[in-house]
Amino acid sequence: MKNNAQLLMPREKMLKFGISALTDVELLALFLRTGTRGKDVLTLAKEMLENFGSLYGLLTSEYEQFSGVHGIGVAKFAQLKGIAELARRYYNVRMREKSPLLSPEMTREFLQSQLTGEEREIFMVIFLDSQHRVITHSRLFSGTLNHVEVHPREIIREAIKINASALILAHNHPSGCAEPSKADKLITERIIKSCQFMDLRVLDHIVIGRGEYVSFAERGWI
């Protein structure tokens, strides 16, 4: 009863002020629903965030880290992984609706939902039509912890097949640092030059790290 009573507080706050009014602790408590023996759900949520540093750190943790620190079992671990997967699928659906990309933030959030937590480098491309509406997105290449082999001709072949007019490139850095390497810059230049011959525009290349990102377009590199 104590857990349920304390959980009602963030619920009441949400109903009165909206979901965005909740703190990270309160939002996490809503999903956890119950605490553990001798620890109410708000206290548990606060301790979890303190141990992992942020929601990002918590949602990308492995089970061994999770249970080792908190000892609260596989059920709550599954709940949290479910939250992350739900967010990923939500953005996946939004990007399939053929609507124009509303903002750079929407694009970044989608890419973070797709690439965060991957243990290998993944190279993705978002294919757009002439109105910059999403046609599709695809994980075209996957590599190792710190390298992925990218072939511009494969990107162009896919773009021609689906009649794309513009592209957004993206890949992740499993190390966590989003700063582009020299190799990242070189492959971007190669892709841009190859696309120019086919009248394809590369709008951006976004590198996703751990809780951070770098946009080539924002830095003026594209």
From Swiss-Prot:
CDD domains: MPN_DUF2466 (cd08071). GO terms for molecular function: metal ion binding; metallopeptidase activity. PROSITE patterns: MPN, UPF0758. The keyword Transmembrane helix does not apply. Keywords: Hydrolase, Metal-binding, Metalloprotease, Protease, Zinc. Residues 100-222 form the MPN domain. The gene is yicR. GO terms for biological process: proteolysis. A motif (JAMM motif) lies at residues 171-184. Zn(2+) binds at H171, H173, D184. This is UPF0758 protein YicR. Belongs to the UPF0758 family. YicR subfamily.
